[in-house]
């Protein structure tokens, strides 16, 4: 944020529900996408920068709510398939298949999607503005392949494979790439 502020950008930043300084105990990408949509419509940014599940949620909301005032997107460490994330949690938390299936049904009933249907690469097909997708090959949270899967379907995507930063991608190298992309006409 500070490097962009020094370049005189106006910054609007939000934390996901149940993350950082936000209230709540429930987080879903769909719930987050609604907050992102509201924020975008309130402030009308020209450039949107989103990280991790925030990037997935931004891609999802923009696929059905095209905002013509947005000129560019930057997606940092975005997951592609919710199924990959959920399988990781399934393994990490050692919950059984019936818990996974119950969660899958809950998501379908509450948000209209099964886990396997929630894919950024599918939603990204509808985003036709210049977009920078950045990922680190050794990201331990989100598979590196997600970058290529999303970019392959996004008409104006540019990818950048970071050599630093892991999943957070908070390094000077990435900051420089984001600034260079943002400043490009």
Question: Where do the model's predicted regions map?
Answer:
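Conserved alpha/beta-hydrolase
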Residues: 1-21
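Short alpha-helix in the alpha/beta-hydrolase fold that links the catalytic acid
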Residues: 120, 129, 143-152, 174
